[in-house]
Amino acid sequence: MKALPFPCIRPAQDRVLEALPAMDSILSDSGALRGAITDGLMLKDPSAAYYVYECSGEPGRVTGVVAICPVNVLTGSDEAAAESVDTLAAARAIAELKVQPRPVTLAYEASPVMDIILGAAKEGASLYAVTDPAGITHRVWEVKREDAVAAIRAMLDQAPEPTPADDPTYAAALAGAAQLLADDARTVGTYTGKEPFNFTVAALFPTAQVSGGAPQVPTGLLTHQIARF
């Protein structure tokens, strides 16, 4: 599969506990998000990175890698979900925000080597470690070092295409938002096929770890800008 490092909009490391409870407001529209970036509450990190994400609590600990994948990994989502009124409204809201609010959860066939690589990344200091009201702890490590990025990319390149493991309505809304933005770009004659909205940020979890239900990265913790605002 194709899964690449990406530039991220995320909470400032020292203000994450302030930012996460305010995400409904911060991500209410692009103006509010711009204000949070100006204020220093949110950080627009321009350098591409992979992120290792771990959540622990009941029923255990799950580790995944966060990357951007071509948005067509979301095609073939539940047709009923794709055509629902709620999905269409959510797609319009995401297209207007111009930011994907949280990674979509996908399952993939991980290799033992990938487990070792991600385990090594987790030996460093974490970027975030926060516990939510449900008692689940979310940890994130940023992977920017060239050799580590290359190792993760090589493993993901060898993996089969991932499968959806998220709410079908959310996955369909992301695909719908990408389509709306692509239609807009085609209308004005600027579409190239390389725009950020042609990619979706995904939390990739080993299939074996999510058979009983896949976790979700908290909204706003790792977001992906899909169009200029």
Describe every region a protein language model picked out.
Residues 1-162, 167-229:
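Surface-exposed, charge/polar-rich loops and edge strands
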